[in-house]
Amino acid sequence: LQSYYEYSQDQRVIDLMTNYFKWQMTVPDDKLLEDYWENSRGGDNIISIYWLYNHTGDAFLLELAEKIHRNTADWTKSTSLPNWHNVNIAQCFREPATYYMQTGDSAMLKASYNVHHLIRRTFGQVPGGMFGADENARLGYIDPRQGVETCGLVEQMASDEIMLCMTGDPMWAEHCEEVAFNSYPAAVMPDFKALRYITCPNHTVSDSKNHHPGIDNRGPFLSMNPFSSRCCQHNHAQGWPYFSEHLVLATPDNGICLLYT
């Protein structure tokens, strides 16, 4: 919706998002973000709230952002994570840094950097910018035989792009390129008519066998398949469009910054 609005200026997007966020304000805390997935990924909600706030200036949106943060899984712990699911980590580690934009609390910004480095110190013996979590990261499974979901690849790219916008730190641009050019192309066919659920750096076969427990998830997840792994089928297409979108960014002095590979 946000991308569509920036293309079309369709007022219905603003109206719909405003009404949705007004509804969220009415949801009691004990009913908000209850589910495992939504509780992990509340940071995406905050990103959209800030986007709308920057277009409308509606004060209630900042109150809602505080409410969402309060009810989202805690990604600020120094030595552990709320869960070890690869897509959650790639998508959610930036939640504290996102909320930092409202609070100015530098500890929140540092927390996102910490999660990024923590997962790679522990499970990062995997080239291509990612970490070993073929569904979930597991102690003892840390070498290049381990893989990561296609969803995890594109969510990591998106998070790197968002972190770049929030911090101006070129590390995030470099890391996004590392994933985009060294991991993502191996996960999809050039014509995007098939993808694999799990991609490993030391990936010598593309068969339909179950490789559990070496691979955490049970199933035929090393094969290129146009029909399985619906989550990745719905998610993978954001990779290159968002990458291209973030090649041109605004600067604080009302200029533009062109990023080249």
Predicted regions located by residue number:
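Glycan-recognition and catalytic cores of secretory/periplasmic carbohydrate-active enzymes
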Residues: 1-259
